[in-house]
Design a protein with these regions (language model features):
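N-terminal Rossmann-like or analogous alpha/beta NTP/dinucleotide-binding catalytic cores
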Residues: 2-131, 276, 286
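Short, histidine-centered active-site or binding-site loop motifs used for metal coordination
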Residues: 8-10, 41-43, 139-140, 197, ...
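Conserved nucleotide- and phosphate/pyrophosphate-binding catalytic cores
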Residues: 18, 149, 155-326
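Short, polar/flexible loop-turn hinges at active-site or ligand-entry regions and domain interfaces
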Residues: 50-51, 140-144, 228
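Short catalytic-loop micro-motif centered on adjacent basic/acidic residues
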Residues: 76-79, 142, 225
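Short helix-capping/linker segments at secondary-structure and domain boundaries
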Residues: 99-103, 135-142, 246-256, 282
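Internal, conserved structured core segments that host functional sites
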Residues: 112-161, 165, 185
Length: 326
């Protein structure tokens, strides 16, 4: 059975971009693959965090994963920092990577632009991501468009390490959802919907009440010509809504576009579709968070399962590179 790995940061409250671009696909994958999913709390440390808030957000993010339908009896769900092999392998891969290829990472360029002080962790972030993936002999990685470059680096590092020290890592492949791989901000459709960027009207959080969802969709930026047409280059706001509608309803982009001749009805139906789709997820979230010990208990169980695999991979890599056995 193929193994699938993916992760989500605990840098803020999960939103519909996370759900349609990742969580929902993960739920489907768990039935057909050996699935490993991770709340990557170490990655959140690339920027300064409030300790109490980070702990809270890590638990919140994990709770939404379970509420979305991930079954801890079928797949593995854990917090990255609970499995120390992630940082252990990251160092071996940092010594395999070059400064030049890390400088070419688009996300580093974007996130460091205009900043007077940038953490070294932000620079080496893609290497830790590579360690996350390679630790689990991963075959497939569900990624958004913005993570493809990091996955290519992961593949390059695996091939390079294998070439130097013998076959050690499985070289993973990317899987990108055909629809809603990258949900954009409702107010700034030129940028991705984000947990870490403050945009109250631009982000639909999974916890949002129905009326809040309706209001955000109603106020979503479109354009002035009034023609319902899917055209991401010239009509990014409307095209984002069409993609989101297609993802939420299971319809094609062409079908959604052909069904409307005005923006108002499209927005209204999209809002109601989102409310309907998110309602059972929100109900499960309320149920699981009613027991404050439930999520920590499930994460501990997942970390034990993940650690059993990760320890073997790190041991193999250490031996290959020439380190003494502890």
């Amino acid at each position: 059975m193929e193994r699938v790995f993916s992760g989500v940061q605990s840098s803020g409250s999960p939103h519909v971009g996370n759900y349609f671009g990742a969580f929902r696909q993960w739920v489907a994958d768990q039935q057909s693959a050996d699935s490993v999913f991770c709340v990557v709390d170490l990655h959140a440390l690339t920027v300064e965090q409030d300790p109490a808030q980070l702990r809270s957000r890590t638990l919140e993010t994990a709770a939404w994963l379970f509420a979305s339908g991930l079954d801890p009896g079928v797949c593995t769900v854990f917090a990255q920092s609970h499995v120390p092999e992630h940082t252990g392998l990251s160092w071996l891969l940092e010594c395999t990577a070059t400064v030049g290829e890390l400088r070419r990472m688009t996300q580093f360029k974007e996130k460091s632009k205009g900043s007077e002080s940038v953490s070294a962790g932000l620079f080496t972030y893609p290497v830790l991501m590579a360690a996350d993936i390679l630790l689990y002999d991963t075959d497939k990685v569900p990624v958004g468009d913005d993570q493809r470059q990091h996955l290519e680096l992961t593949r390059d590092l695996a091939v390079r390490f294998n070439g130097r020290y013998g076959d050690t890592f499985v070289v993973p492949e990317a899987v990108v959802p055909k629809v809603a791989a990258r949900v954009m901000d409702l107010q700034h459709p030129e940028r991705k919907m984000s947990k870490s960027v403050t945009s109250p009207l631009g982000t639909i959080d999974l916890i949002d009440e129905p009326e809040t969802i309706r209001q955000k969709i109603r106020k979503a930026v479109t354009d002035t010509d009034g023609e319902v047409r899917y055209d991401p280059e010239h009509k990014p706001g409307l095209s984002n809504l069409i993609e989101l509608f297609a993802a939420a309803s299971g319809r094609s982009i062409e079908d959604v576009t052909a069904s409307y001749d005005r923006y108002g009805p499209l927005k209204a139906d999209l809002a109601e579709t989102l409310v309907e789709v998110l309602a059972p997820v929100q109900e499960r979230y309320a149920k699981i968070t009613a027991d404050p010990e439930a999520v920590p208990r499930l994460l501990e169980m997942g970390a034990r399962k993940a650690g059993a695999v990760a320890s073997g991979t790190l041991r193999r890599a250490r031996q290959a590179i020439g380190l003494l056995a502890p």
